[in-house]
Amino acid sequence: MNRGIPFRHLLLVLQLALLPAVTQGKKVVLGKKGDTVELTCNASQKKNTQFHWKNSNQIKILGIQGLFLTKGPSKLSDRADSRKSLWDQGCFSMIIKNLKIEDSDTYICEVENKKEEVELLVFGLTANSDTHLLEGQSLTLTLESPPGSSPSVKCRSPGGKNIQGGRTISVPQLERQDSGTWTCTVSQDQKTVEFKIDIVVLAFQKASSTVYKKEGEQVEFSFPLAFTLEKLTGSGELWWQAERASSSKSWITFDLKNKEVSVKRVTQDPKLQMGKKLPLHLTLPQALPQYAGSGNLTLALEAKTGKLHQEVNLVVMRATQFQENLTCEVWGPTSPKLTLSLKLENKGATVSKQAKAVWVLNPEAGMWQCLLSDSGQVLLESNIKVVPTWPTPVQPMALIVLGGVAGLLLFTGLGIFFCVRCRHRRRQAERMSQIKRLLSEKKTCQCPHRFQKTCSPI
């Protein structure tokens, strides 16, 4: 009885010695769906030797027979391979291409009477909807994972936004700075795998912009897009709310096809001009107070729900002098913090207010500056020259004309004076002659037919 015990122990030791391999600790490798993974298996000696790769069901995937690579009847036979150039170095890794979630399994490498187990976990991260989304829409990322796993996901946007989640990550209200490559890290069993997802946020580069112009200047509006697409088709419209108007109106409508712009309809007042190529570009011939206000450009893209929006503002400045009053005014949407001032060149501000109109009574002669500023930064400037009101400089031609008129008046006056004087003298001479004639006549009746009977010569 006692003699049988050592024999059984000897038999057990013999069986263990005859085992083809000794199982070592299991390694965990994370892979990405659609990607390629390499499962390593190294021999203790750097030489070519026999090895076999099997799955958890002991089905052969690939191995070496003589000097040739052989494959078994597994589902990976057409996607599995090994680096033959590294066999002489004792490296017998297995490469699996175009990974699938169902490739997640425990794989066994048998080499030099030992076994190496590698647990492969394949994950996939995809966007539930199109990766081209309008600004303000939501983004949802879904993680595909093998059964039994409990991964965690952390994503970082191009703008530095960090979002954590499990099998689903939701990003509401996408912003233009979210456009670009998102980096998502999947963690499982202290191992990580990184995903790169390109998200395109369809938006204009700016949410709003303000153009500052002096009255009469040409105005340029630009609406650059924050993305590029091979084919871009859609339609757009610019609605404008003038500060002086009671309601908004459509200034222009246009079509966009393969990055070329064609105008459909445009108002006659003002008559905008539009560029034929991207970026969208509008020209207003003159900046006038009646055009100052705010506009909203919308762009509807083909096969997309919703529209792109950009707000644009126009501020117009006018500097005028009327009689003894110098005035500076602005029209359009301005912040209450903006300062409007009037100053004589090379001197301090005469008047400065947080208002839309300032004025100076009886301004000094010289070059005056009308300035619209924001915290000391000049946004808009208009110059106006004030000339002395008295004495007014007289031009040489005016002097000649005035001299001629004065000479003519003087000559005419002298002529009239001498004519009147000559006539007066003639009448006076006639009267004196008549008096002398009467005195020289005899005292006879002035009317002979009446005094004939009483009058006789002496």
Swiss-Prot record:
It holds the Pfam family ig. Residues 419-458 are cytoplasmic. Residues 26-125 form the Ig-like V-type domain. GO terms for cellular component: cell surface; plasma membrane. A lipid is attached at residues 419, 422 (S-palmitoyl cysteine). Residues 126-203, 204-317, 318-374 form the Ig-like C2-type domain. Keywords: Adaptive immunity, Cell membrane, Disulfide bond, Glycoprotein, Immunity, Immunoglobulin domain, Lipoprotein, Membrane, Palmitate, Phosphoprotein, Repeat, Signal, Transmembrane, Transmembrane helix. Its main location: membrane. GO terms for biological process: adaptive immune response; cell adhesion; T cell differentiation; T cell selection. The modification Phosphoserine is found at residues 433, 440, 456. Residues 26-396 are extracellular. The keyword NADP does not apply. The chain crosses the membrane at residues 397-418. Integral membrane glycoprotein that plays an essential role in the immune response and serves multiple functions in responses against both external and internal offenses. In T-cells, functions primarily as a coreceptor for MHC class II molecule:peptide complex. The antigens presented by class II peptides are derived from extracellular proteins while class I peptides are derived from cytosolic proteins. Interacts simultaneously with the T-cell receptor (TCR) and the MHC class II presented by antigen presenting cells (APCs). Forms disulfide-linked homodimers at the cell surface. Interacts with LCK. Interacts with PTK2/FAK1. Binds to P4HB/PDI. Interacts with IL16; this interaction induces a CD4-dependent signaling in lymphocytes. Interacts (via Ig-like V-type domain) with MHCII alpha chain (via alpha-2 domain) and beta chain (via beta-2 domain); this interaction increases the affinity of TCR for peptide-MHCII. CD4 oligomerization via Ig-like C2-type 2 and 3 domains appears to be required for stable binding to MHCII and adhesion between T cells and APCs. This is T-cell surface glycoprotein CD4.
